[in-house]
């Protein structure tokens, strides 16, 4: 299939708007400039639209196998495409866990059969993600593992993490860490702070996260391993990562949209759609995350898309599962709250969602260039709409942003040269 995207505008390296047409042939961008349509290609009229590299999210939970009531690879991929994402990386906290070559091959086949976007599967660090026995990294890499993580739980012993880092470094793969010391959770369901004290809830202290990061950056230095911090959430964690980068340690970090947008003081009542892990932290933590993203301490934005059923979330705060969905709302929320008000440039936001995650992990995506993968998102920066969870393509409706009005919405997504999502008014 061939497409010609006409009349749109792109951002150049300086963040300036430039009008350009883009030709897609097969899975590849084959021309950029002022182009005329040929008889054998489909024209997409992008007049008034930003033509962006497809978004990249290196932290999603698609729940399959074992959690299909919450999400599947197919429904998660559709949600990603609607949100403008063309590449996502799926976490391994499924049942069963992708901890063997055979299970990883099953996941890869399922992706090929059902996904409309590129899905990169993580493999687990430990068997069944219970932290006491290492998986076969070499076999899992051969089966297509993107990187290694036990996301959902932290690796509790330094010895296990150090061994994992040495094995990962030997095969040029990253260790991706959910940073949480179980001895410091204290049965908490929210941040230890204003909200927990006001509502009589056990709180999770900031040091629960930062102490693991402090341990792990030293282990990563010793192992010469690429160490990536998931969903960083505290000012202390930002400080540790900043210092580690200054020391030349191979550490990268991501931050979620919800930690950039909300803090614990924003939680209304006991709404479990505001319960995620790590929890919403203090206003000071939120400010440190924004500063860390802007100064390069934090490398990119990832949603930590974590769908649950409404039945699971419809309970008291201490019993509800952690997690919210984010793929279909990330760009409009961030554009509205940071770009529209002048805090960030449009190019900064686009980079945090495209080239930056690719640079962090050496992926050949995230740009609009001739010869590169045809991963393209068309965005209507003038479109205003209210977030409505009932329109989500994800099975998960667990969002704290339902009813929020946002400007700037993806309206079409091309993933590897195939039209993965469109609103129905663009193709001629």
From Swiss-Prot:
What keywords appear on the UniProt entry? Hydrolase, Metal-binding, Pyrimidine biosynthesis, Zinc
Q: What is this protein called?
A: Dihydroorotase
Q: What GO MF terms are annotated?
A: allantoinase activity; dihydroorotase activity; zinc ion binding
Question: Which E.C. number(s) belong to this protein?
Answer: 3.5.2.3
Residues recorded as binding substrate, renumbered to this chain, are 61-63, 93, 277, 308, 322-323
GO process annotations (BP): 'de novo' UMP biosynthetic process; purine nucleobase catabolic process
Main function: Catalyzes the reversible cyclization of carbamoyl aspartate to dihydroorotate.
The protein's annotated pathway: Pyrimidine metabolism; UMP biosynthesis via de novo pathway; (S)-dihydroorotate from bicarbonate: step 3/3
Residues recorded as binding Zn(2+) 2, renumbered to this chain, are 151, 178, 231
The family database entries (InterPro entries) matched by this protein are listed as:
Amidohydro-rel (IPR006680), DHOase (IPR004722), DHOase/Allantoinase_Hydrolase (IPR050138), Dihydroorotase_CS (IPR002195), Metal-dep_hydrolase_composite (IPR011059), Metal_Hydrolase (IPR032466)
Report the co-factor binding details.
Binds 2 Zn(2+) ions per subunit.
Known cofactor(s): Zn(2+)
Which residues catalyse the reaction? 304
Family membership noted in the UniProt record: Belongs to the metallo-dependent hydrolases superfamily. DHOase family. Class I DHOase subfamily.
Instruction: Name its species.
Output: Bacillus subtilis (strain 168)
The reaction(s) annotated as catalysed by this protein in its Swiss-Prot or TrEMBL entry are: (S)-dihydroorotate + H2O = N-carbamoyl-L-aspartate + H(+)
Q: Which Pfam families match?
A: Amidohydro_1 (PF01979)
Q: Which GO terms describe its cellular component?
A: cytoplasm
Signal peptide range in chain numbering: none
In which residues is Zn(2+) 1 bound? 59, 61, 151, 304
């Amino acid at each position: 299939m061939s497409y010609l995207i006409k009349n749109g505008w792109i951002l150049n390296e300086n963040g300036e708007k430039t009008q350009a047409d883009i030709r897609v042939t097969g899975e590849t961008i084959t021309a950029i400039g002022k182009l005329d349509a040929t008889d054998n290609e489909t024209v997409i009229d992008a007049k008034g639209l930003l033509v962006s590299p497809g978004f990249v999210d290196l932290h999603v939970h698609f729940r399959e196998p074992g959690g299909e009531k919450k999400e599947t690879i197919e429904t998660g991929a559709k949600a990603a495409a609607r949100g403008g994402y063309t590449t996502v990386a799926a976490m391994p906290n499924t049942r069963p866990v992708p901890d063997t070559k055979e299970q990883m091959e099953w996941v890869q086949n399922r992706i090929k059969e059902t996904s409309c976007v590129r899905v990169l599967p993580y493999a687990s660090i430990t068997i069944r993600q219970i932290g006491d026995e290492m998986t076969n990294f070499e076999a899992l890499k051969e089966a297509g593992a993107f990187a290694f993580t036990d996301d959902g739980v932290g690796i509790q012993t330094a010895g296990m993490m150090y061994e994992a880092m040495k094995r990962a470094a030997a095969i040029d793969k990253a260790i991706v860490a959910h940073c949480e010391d179980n001895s410091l959770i204290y049965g908490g369901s929210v941040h230890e702070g204003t909200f927990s004290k006001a509502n009589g809830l056990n709180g999770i202290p900031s040091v629960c996260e930062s102490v693991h990061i402090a341990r792990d950056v030293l282990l990563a230095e010793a192992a010469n391993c690429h160490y990536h911090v998931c969903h960083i959430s505290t000012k202390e964690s930002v400080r540790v990562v900043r210092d580690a980068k200054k020391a030349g340690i191979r550490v990268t970090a991501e931050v979620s949209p919800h930690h950039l947008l909300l803090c614990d003081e924003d939680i209304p009542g006991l709404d479990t759609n505001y319960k995620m892990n790590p929890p919403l932290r203090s206003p000071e933590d939120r400010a440190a995350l924004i500063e860390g993203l802007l100064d390069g301490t934090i490398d990119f934005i990832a949603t930590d898309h974590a769908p649950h059923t409404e039945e699971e979330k419809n309970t008291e705060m201490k019993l509800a599962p952690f997690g919210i969905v984010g793929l279909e709302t990330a760009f409009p929320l961030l554009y509205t709250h940071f770009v529209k008000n002048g805090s960030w440039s449009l190019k900064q936001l686009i980079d945090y969602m495209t080239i930056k995650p690719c640079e962090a992990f050496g992926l050949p995506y995230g740009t609009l260039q001739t010869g590169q993968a045809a991963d393209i998102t068309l965005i209507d920066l003038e479109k205003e709409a209210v977030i409505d969870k009932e329109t989500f393509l994800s099975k998960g409706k667990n969002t704290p942003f339902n009813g929020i009005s946002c400007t700037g919405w993806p309206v079409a997504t091309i993933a590897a040269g195939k039209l993965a999502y469109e609103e129905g008014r663009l193709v001629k």
